[in-house]
C-alpha cells in the first residue's frame, strides 16, 4: 500500500533547525542531515506501516546516521501526516500538542 505523505510547515521548521545545529557542529553535516531526513520521509509512502507506534498512534521512523532523531507521524486513511522531526529523547508533551492540532 502506498500512502500520500503530508509535511506541514512546522515539520520543515524542525528539519531546518536540526540541520543548522548539525552544521554548526561540523560544516556539511547539516546537508547530510537534510538528505537523510528527506530520504526517510520519501520512504514513508511505502514503509509507513513497518514502524511501530511509539506513543498512542504516533509512529517513529528513526534516521540511521543521526539515530537520535526520527520522523514522527500518524496514519490517517491513505495519508501519512508528519508531526515532527525531533530528537527521540524529548519529552512527548510537545508531540501530543501537534497531534491534537491534526484533529
Show the residue positions of the predicted features:
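Short arginine-rich
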Residues: 21-25, 44-49
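Enriched for short, Lys/Arg-rich terminal
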Residues: 68-70, 74-103
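Arg/Lys-rich, positively charged N-terminal/basic patches that mediate binding to nucleic acids
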Residues: 1-34
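Short, hydrophobic secondary-structure boundary micro-motifs
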Residues: 31-32, 52-54, 93-94
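Basic/aromatic recognition patch in beta-strand/loop cores that engages polyanionic ligands
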Residues: 39, 46-81
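Residues at the C-termini of beta-strands that transition into short coil/loop
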Residues: 9, 64, 86
Amino acid at each position: 500500500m502506498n500512502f500520500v505523505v503530508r509535511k506541514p510547515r512546522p515539520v520543515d521548521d524542525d528539519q531546518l533547525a536540526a540541520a543548522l545545529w548539525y552544521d554548526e557542529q561540523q560544516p556539511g553535516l547539516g546537508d547530510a542531515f537534510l538528505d537523510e531526513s528527506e530520504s526517510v520521509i520519501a520512504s514513508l509512502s511505502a514503509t509507513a506501516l513497518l514502524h511501530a507506534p511509539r506513543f498512542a498512534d504516533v509512529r517513529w521512523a528513526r534516521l540511521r546516521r543521526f539515530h537520535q532523531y526520527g520522523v514522527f507521524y500518524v496514519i490517517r486513511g491513505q495519508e501519512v501526516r508528519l508531526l515532527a522531526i525531533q530528537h527521540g529523547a524529548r519529552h512527548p508533551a510537545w508531540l501530543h500538542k501537534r497531534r491534537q492540532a491534526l484533529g
